[in-house]
Amino acid sequence: MPVNPANPAGPATTSGTAQSSGAPVSVGIVLVSHSRSLAESALDLARRLIVAVDVPVELAAGLADGALGTDPGLIVSVVEPLADRCDGVLMLADLGRGIMSAEMALEMLEPAVDDRVRLSAAPFVEGLLGAYGAAGIGKDLAAVAAEADGAAEAKRSQVSAF
């Protein structure tokens, strides 16, 4: 995974473009995580399991010094350029403080950008898989968010089946 060139030990971002139909993907995804390696691994899993598409995904993961943590300013710096390239942006956060940082970042965005960004309550990995697949086939932000949010119920039904 690429490293932030301004800070090799700091948070990384990575992105892709749609390959499935030649059309641009309308929704990008931001992974907000306390751990850069967790976000990179989750993205790697999504890309390996859903190989027919390549969705723009950016990481807002870890702190500039390489420590665990989240930073609302970093989230904003990742969301804004992604929102410039996509019709909508879905954020997925790993844990409570990540959610708080993502909510703070939403408040820091310009209204024109904020209107096109949504924070999902979906589980991090399962939500990413659902969102990645839905975004990869060109679904809009509401549909991508619904796919991510439905991941928890799908997992719950699998677990209760045993």
Please name every model-derived segment.
Residues P2-F162:
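N-terminal loops that bind phosphate or other acidic moieties
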